């Protein structure tokens, strides 16, 4: 928890956030977040969506993997990369990219919440990353669309929403350069695992199955949604890595330009046949 002295310092810089805060360390960065204890509903359960600025400590593993994937991708390119995180919350993911990955040229982090953008900007300054990280306060799709023009596109876009990423996929693929890497998180596992199948069909364009391997199906539904969305822009995808962890699924896919690439992605889509009488 912040001491009274630190709170006074924050106020002196015009950074009285209007809610209780505390310092957290993750990876190589130290940053301010809403006080987690305030939003606990039990000894083990924390509700990040109830906080004025989003931060989920359970997703640290997600961010750890993202750092490793982006570093490997940057090394495979052999040049500096430009990164965008359009739904940043407190800013920790984007700041970690800048602080922990060699070869990052620029990181643009954004949140539509003024409180989140304000806190993220403070965290960028606290970690001495203002030379690499810029903070934007606008709608995520508007931000991504502004970078959809040639020579403005990113090498890596990380979409990590609270819920489904489908609302941002169209803008995200357009904001990526040829061969760029798109990372998607989906936490709406109830539709994806068949509890609400109609919602899944509406969002992802596929029907889920309530089976013991429903999380694998969820990843494939997300990949299929990405493939069809990218194909509308004559882009194909190549899934490089995915995982299902705790309450979410995660997908990393390379986006390649060209109608042939799009056709190849669509041809890889198919159907799963499952007999509930046999299994």
Question: Which positions does each model-derived feature cover?
Answer:
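SAM-dependent transferase fold signal centered on methyltransferase-like domains
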Residues: 1-279
